């Protein structure tokens, strides 16, 4: 069975866009792959974090994974910082990465420009750690969005470089992009991706938003003036985005939804979608609360840590042996 790895930062509550584009799809692949789902808290601290808030968000994200439908009997759910192999392998890959290729990363350049108080070295060395997250589990498949595509290209380059120098030690992962319609955009500016870090609360719906508040956000979402409910990303980005959300939460095809609302106005469509979103959040948040407040969550994370430590150990030792680290045993 092939291995799939995915990591999410505990830097805020995921949105319904994260749910439709990633979390929901993870549930569907649990029977087909050996899955490792990682809460990448060491990536989160590449920018300043409040200690207590970060701890809370780690637990929240774990409960969100489980509320989504991640099954700990099928998949490994764990916290990055509890598996030392990540940073150990990350350092090894950092030594074969060049400053130039790290500085060319678009995310580094974007975040560095916003830091008037100096650029943390962790922002620069983020990609080798991300590569290590992936390779220590002999990962075959990595589902990523467009924003991580460049990092994945670097990961594959680092694997090629390591294998060229030290013989074929690492598995070269393949990238899996989101399904068509899986990319959810901002509600007020549908030309940009929905983001949990957006300053405008009306642009996104958090998985922990009050359901009635989320419904209002749908009703006030940007559309257009022609009143035709049709999927057309280029010419009708607003209504196309709402169709993606409708389809993602109901599993109805966009074509069926278009047919259902043929001749109907945006008011009727938005009203129905707002109820769908509200009902989804009520149900989701009930599951979330049951996991967040349960001791079972810690047991699940403890077991995930043990499985991840065991799975990563073999690859880490191969890397160390290849580079001549430690003692010969």
Curated annotation (Swiss-Prot):
UniProt signal peptide: none
Motif 'KMSKS' region, residue numbers: 193-197
GO biological process: tryptophanyl-tRNA aminoacylation
Keyword ATP-binding: yes
Motif ('HIGH' region): 10-18
Primary site of residence: cytoplasm
Keyword terms: Aminoacyl-tRNA synthetase, ATP-binding, Cytoplasm, Ligase, Nucleotide-binding, Protein biosynthesis
Record Pfam families: tRNA-synt_1b
GO cellular component, one term: cytosol
HAMAP family xrefs: Trp_tRNA_synth_B (MF_00140_B)
Assembly with partners or alone: Homodimer.
Protein name: Tryptophan--tRNA ligase
Lineage summary: Bacteria, Bacillati, Bacillota, Bacilli, Bacillales
């Amino acid at each position: 069975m092939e291995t799939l790895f995915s990591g999410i930062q505990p830097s805020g509550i995921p949105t319904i866009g994260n749910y439709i584009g990633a979390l929901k799809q993870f549930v569907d692949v649990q029977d087909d792959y050996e899955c490792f789902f990682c809460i990448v808290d060491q990536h989160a601290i590449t920018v300043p974090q409040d200690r207590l808030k970060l701890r809370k968000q780690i637990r929240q994200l774990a409960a969100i994974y489980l509320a989504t439908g991640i099954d700990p009997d099928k998949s490994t759910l764990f916290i990055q910082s509890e598996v030392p192999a990540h940073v150990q392998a990350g350092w090894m890959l950092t030594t074969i990465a060049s400053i130039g290729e790290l500085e060319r990363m678009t995310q580094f350049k974007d975040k560095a420009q916003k830091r008037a108080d100096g650029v943390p070295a962790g922002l620069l060395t983020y990609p080798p750690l991300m590569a290590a997250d992936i390779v220590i589990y002999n990962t075959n498949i990595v589902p990523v969005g467009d924003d991580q595509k460049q990092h994945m290209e670097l990961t594959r380059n680092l694997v090629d470089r390591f294998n060229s120098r030290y013989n074929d030690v690492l598995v070269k992962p393949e990238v899996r992009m989101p399904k068509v319609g899986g990319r959810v955009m901002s509600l007020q500016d549908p030309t940009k991706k929905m983001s949990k870090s957006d300053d405008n609360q009306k642009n996104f719906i958090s998985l922990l938003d009050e359901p009635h508040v989320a419904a209002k956000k749908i009703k006030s979402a940007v559309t257009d003036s022609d009143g035709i409910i049709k999927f057309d990303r280029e010419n009708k980005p607003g209504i196309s985005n709402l169709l993606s959300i409708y389809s993602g939460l109901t599993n109805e095809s966009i074509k069926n939804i278009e047919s259902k609302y043929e001749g109907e106005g945006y008011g009727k469509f938005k009203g129905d979608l707002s109820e769908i979103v509200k009902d989804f959040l009520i149900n989701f948040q009930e599951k979330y609360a049951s996991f967040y407040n349960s001791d079972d969550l810690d047991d699940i994370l403890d077991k995930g840590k043990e499985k991840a430590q065991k799975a990563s150990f073999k690859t880490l030792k191969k890397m160390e042996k290849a580079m001549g680290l430690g003692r010969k045993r």
